[in-house]
Amino acid sequence: MRIVLAVLGLLLSIVSAQADKAVASGRPLKLYEAYATNPDCTSAGAIVLRVAQPPGHGRVSINQAGVFPSFPQSNPRSACNRRRVPGVQATYVSQRGYLGPDLVVLQALFPSGRGVNITVAIRVM
């Protein structure tokens, strides 16, 4: 019974998000960035970011990077907004000369156990 509840809890903790972006053909486009930050601005743990569905007309690179967080002023971590914190970024580059639509689905797994699926529709111009 506990295993079923744990699996159900994990499935319910995966959230979906959608975004639309435009980019010039062959130019890099930041698709997504994520961070897990303690109140002292140190990392709260590693984030696993992976490509769940690759683009049909380009490539996605995932790299560890310093990112600027955007915590609301009411959050004790808002002091971290003024500096880079450890994070991860996904960047898209289309095939050279390609013009048209593309689509990427990313999956981010946070140290807290929360998961997010991110669908990004891309218009390559």
Predicted features, each with a name:
Residues 5-13:
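Bacterial N-terminal signal peptides
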Residues 15-19:
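Sec/Tat signal peptide C-region and signal peptidase I cleavage site
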Residues 20-21, 32, 36, 112-125:
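C-terminal edge beta-strand
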Residues 28-41, 47-52, 106:
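Core beta-strand segments of extracellular beta-sandwich domains
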Residues 41-84:
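Surface-exposed or secretory-pathway low-complexity segments enriched in glycine-proline
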Residues 48, 103, 117-121:
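Well-ordered beta-strand positions in beta-sheet-rich domains
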Residues 78-96:
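Contiguous, well-folded functional domains in the mature portion of proteins
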Residues 90-92, 98-111:
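A short beta-strand micro-motif common to beta-rich folds, especially ectodomain repeats
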